[in-house]
């Protein structure tokens, strides 16, 4: 029951009330989309100020103990002060949650799962999640937003949101991971998420900031309201083109996201062109086909014309070496279309040695 209370307290949100200060593919937590889900690419970057974040949270924890702030009806003392530690596992989860929450703006996930439905590090269990949105490019701004709840909490202001502050000062929380995601397409560019855990031994490695990246996010198909396909409309026989499928999550705005995996692709004529599960079209013979991609109840089609023949570019690989007793064999594979052919290398009929030179006891001799 204590966990349920802690989670209920922790699941609160905060957005800034003032004016704005300023306006590599990263994998998801699962290796393939869950049932009824797809992977999309969300553009953005991660900011890391992990050392400064831990330092600031511990300052807030120490202050609460020194000032006797109450937790669960009991005043904290300096004996209650326990420095919180960084968790590499929680940080990874917080980064995923920051990207998701930049779109949902709440404690909900685009894949329909619980915000605590992750593989957690060690033997512990999460106690709370806190979120913040702002216009900065700093991880510390979110922490200061959570800290701003202190006054209302100490005064006992009715109806005040204080779960972020109490998550930081609760001595039972021993580990934290914070993720800050900068998404220029979001309502607030900066989304900062943190998750807390109690006891357990965990890796404390801190991740670095990233440049502009494509973050892989799992999305429930029901969240997709429209899809559109783009790419080359023609391909030569034996060559390949990649079509791009983009999806709009209508409930969360008009931004379109590239679908990375989970869509169903098909061709209207597999003798003319084939298509892979990721939208790679291979021309097989002259003709026109319709390529269709389906995500849930949404689909998009694209007409592709296959023209000409492949101008083969072969790479050779010896599969059997020729000897004086038997023929050799070289496999030639076209780098464009994958066509294979074998070239026979006739067996060696004779061997002629040329003049050689060697040194023996410091003296050079010819043979």
Regions found by a protein language model. Give the residues of each.
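Bacterial N-terminal signal peptides
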Residues: 2-14
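A short, surface-exposed interaction/processing loop segment used at functional sites
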Residues: 202-221
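Short, well-ordered surface patches within globular domains
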Residues: 24-123, 165, 171-176, 180-181
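Short, solvent-exposed loop/turn segments that connect beta-strands within catalytic domains
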Residues: 69, 138, 184-190, 252-257, ...
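Sec-dependent signal peptide cleavage junction
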Residues: 11-26
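A well-ordered secondary-structure block
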Residues: 115-206
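Extracytoplasmic soluble-region selector
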Residues: 221-350, 357-367
């Amino acid at each position: 029951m204590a966990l349920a209370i802690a989670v209920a307290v922790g699941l609160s949100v905060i957005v800034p009330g003032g004016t704005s200060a300023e306006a590599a593919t990263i994998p998801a937590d699962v290796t393939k989309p869950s049932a009824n889900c797809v992977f999309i690419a969300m553009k953005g970057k991660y900011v890391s100020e992990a050392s400064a974040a831990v330092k600031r949270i511990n300052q807030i924890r120490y202050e609460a103990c020194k000032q006797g702030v109450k937790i669960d009806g009991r005043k904290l003392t300096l004996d209650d002060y326990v420095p919180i530690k960084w968790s590499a596992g929680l940080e990874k989860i917080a980064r995923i949650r920051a990207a998701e929450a930049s779109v949902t703006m709440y404690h909900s996930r685009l894949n329909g799962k619980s915000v605590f439905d992750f593989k957690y590090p060690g033997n512990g269990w999460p106690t709370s999640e806190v979120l913040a949105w702002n216009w900065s490019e700093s991880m510390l701004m979110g922490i200061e937003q959570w800290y701003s709840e202190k006054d209302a909490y100490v005064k006992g202001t009715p109806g005040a949101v204080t779960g972020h502050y109490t998550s930081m000062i609760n001595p039972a929380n021993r580990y934290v991971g914070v993720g800050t995601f900068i998404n220029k397409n979001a309502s607030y560019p900066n989304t900062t998420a943190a998750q807390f855990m109690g006891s357990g031994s965990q890796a404390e490695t801190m991740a670095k900031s990233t440049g502009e990246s494509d973050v892989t996010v799992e999305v429930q198909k029901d969240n997709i309201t429209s899809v559109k396909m783009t790419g080359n409309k023609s391909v030569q026989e034996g060559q390949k083109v990649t079509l791009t499928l983009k999806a709009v999550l209508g409930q969360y705005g008009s931004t379109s996201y590239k679908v990375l995996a989970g869509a169903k692709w098909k061709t209207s004529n597999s003798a003319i062109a084939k298509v892979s599960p990721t939208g790679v079209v291979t021309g097989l013979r002259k003709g026109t086909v319709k390529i269709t991609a389906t995500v849930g109840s949404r689909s998009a089609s694209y007409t592709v014309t296959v023209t000409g023949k492949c101008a083969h570019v072969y790479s050779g690989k010896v599969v059997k070496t020729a000897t004086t007793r038997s023929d050799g064999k070289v496999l030639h594979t076209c780098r464009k279309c994958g066509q294979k052919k074998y070239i026979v290398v006739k067996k060696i009929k004779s061997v002629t040695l040329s003049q050689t030179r060697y040194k023996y006891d410091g003296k050079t001799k010819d043979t």
